[in-house]
Amino acid sequence: MALYEHIFLARQDISAQQVDALVEQYKGVIESFGGKVGRVENWGLKSLTYRIKKNRKAHYALMDIDAPAAAVHEVERQMRINEDVLRYMTIAVEAHEEGPSAMMQKRDRDDRPRRDGDRPDRGPREDRGPRPPREGGFGDREDRPRRPREDRA
């Protein structure tokens, strides 16, 4: 039997329990063909990059499958028929990853780069004094001459 990773996206307006029911339904199909489902991860409701069938969000689910190709074809056929499934993708893999997938791993806050917008080698702006005025440009709005209003007909 071959090893697969199977990911599917379900519509945003179904509940998490209905997503779990879909996973159990497809798990039953795979087991009826003599396959096994290892890890099952529900990634939850996430925003889509672009709209799919008028949906902006979707429930993501991942299944690690050890089954014959006929089982995978049957699961994909049933997903094509089901209106609650927006997209699916099955990938053949050499071995299943141990532990949680990359989507489920939490990054440590200390590992993330700083996002305060200032370079770490400089102090706060107050330590460096005020910025000099720009040359040739107008600083604040009060310094600019008023623009004449155009009458629109």
Curated annotation (Swiss-Prot):
Keywords: Ribonucleoprotein, Ribosomal protein, RNA-binding, rRNA-binding. Residues 94-153 are annotated as: Disordered. GO terms for molecular function: small ribosomal subunit rRNA binding; structural constituent of ribosome. GO terms for biological process: translation. InterPro entries: Ribosomal_bS6, Ribosomal_bS6_sf, Ribosomal_S6_plastid/chlpt, Transl_elong_EF1B/ribsomal_bS6. It holds the Pfam family Ribosomal_S6. One of its GO terms (cellular component) is cytosolic small ribosomal subunit. Binds together with bS18 to 16S ribosomal RNA. Belongs to the bacterial ribosomal protein bS6 family. This is Small ribosomal subunit protein bS6.
